Amino acid sequence: MKHLLFCIIALLLPTVTTAENRTYKLEVKSLQVVVNQDWLSPAVMRLKGDDVLNIGFDELSHDYHRYVYRLERCEADWTTSEELFESDWLEGFNHNVIDNYEHSINTTVPYTHYKLQIPNDRCRLKLSGNYRLHISEDGSDEDIATVEFMVTEQSMTLSVNVSSNTDIDTNQSHQQVSFGVKYGNHIMTDPQDQIQTVVMQNAREDTWRRNVRPSYISQNGLEWQHKKELIFDGGNEYRKFEILDPSHPTLGIEHVSWDGKNYQAQPYISEPRMNYLYDEDANGAFYIRNSDNRENDIISDYVWVNYRLKAPQFIEGHIVIDGHWATEHPDTYLMNYDASQDLYTASILQKLGYYSYQYLWMKEDGSTHPLPSEGNFYETENRYQILVYFKGTGERTWRLTAYSQTIIN
């Protein structure tokens, strides 16, 4: 029965987990995807510029694995770009070895850190749009990880506004997005067929609002005003903790102990938050580092983080832990109810660093909602991302022509 439950969760959770990045091997941990050094933002890079996509991950051993990567060009809906030749979007080679790796040093959990960059001297992207990068062992067809990122050409102009004065309520529990796009030099014959849009909150897949019909169509652009489909729950600020040294508890950590094999970190019990209190957070982002902030990739150790949430037991659905670092098998982030303590608990192996996270209530249909005990407030500082895709007359693919990120505060 437990195996069946995990299978059901695995089917539902991909629509819940924030990151489009996935790991499929138990020993692969701490998948990081960052453009330049901006760890707070989604992986969106400019087509013509100096942006660099940095990808890194750990394999929990000192054994060498010959990992390779290949790129896949995708359409606006993340299906493969079947009508394009590889040479249309890629300059160079599309089956490359990850030859940059280092073993961990003096860690209780041994691991090997692998990393790569896009573009590099072997491959460079020629076209804007969506991309999926597959990582596997050389000679194997099975991915050990996949990474999704976007390349924007910024050839259209976006204007965005987020307000707590919504078409549902005013200054209560919701936030509403309004935005407009200017075509620029693009020739537009049928805007509703040639434009696709995505709006999301904190880069969470389960908040994506795709192709909402515009309110106004003009010769120069489109506008989305007073659209109920663009109203979002305010939610609450993400919770956070930071573990920089397993021998000393730091931000959000009650204590750290050694069980003879691993370090065990106990964040403070997550108590109900019925009133809003501003607390600067990272909206699900994470940053690997240690107390010396040096050689973070190979000196930072792993600890078991034991989450505890004070909440009544839910009869329907499940409670999951959510953050951009949550890339492993879905049941890793499923919380179990401990009736003896009246707590939901979960234990996750994580690398030293700063982590931003939230608890979500996942219903049986896979939809996610703020926990009643976490609160739902219009003041919450959320980040909204807007993407605009364009497909010109006679063109074979959707290009990402505009991207913007706006913070409500």
Place the predicted regions along the sequence by residue.
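Bacterial Sec-dependent N-terminal signal peptides
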Residues: M1-N21
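Low-complexity, Pro/Ser/Thr- and charge-rich linker/hinge segments at domain boundaries
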Residues: T23, V151-H174, F377-A402
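Aromatic-rich carbohydrate-binding modules that target alpha-glucans
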Residues: W89-Y114, E205-V212, W304-L352, M362-G392
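Ligand-binding face of N-terminal immunoglobulin V-set domains in extracellular IgSF glycoproteins
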Residues: T108-D138
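Exposed aromatic-hydrophobic patches
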Residues: H113-D121, S218-I231, L343-Q350
